[in-house]
């Protein structure tokens, strides 16, 4: 087994994320990132993400969603204010399929937006809260979005995939 995965703590929760490009099996780290997990799961349960678009795709980097306005500048946390980053030393951006909070490059500014990694992104270490990962063969559903045609100025897909 790869040492990449040996360093990760065990996951303690699972959910199925329905998207227009296929389902994603996601396992969560609620012990390491309790605020991010609670926020994400509650938004899923409340239907906040239903029908929203993945507004940003960067080839071989990431897929971003979770903004109810679809613009990349909206959304709020379940507490209606930003919440703190939860950086854990055993959770690193060293493989594809990680689920993390998007924060506009400002510390402790997490709201509703999140992203999935499409490749290792070590330069993000200590900058974003990792709180889950895509598991099993559903990782291949996620990887199909890397080749979507996007607006080169905004990274917005010309035909944005959606959360269901």
Named regions from a protein language model:
Residues 1-164:
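Cyclophilin-like peptidyl-prolyl cis-trans isomerases
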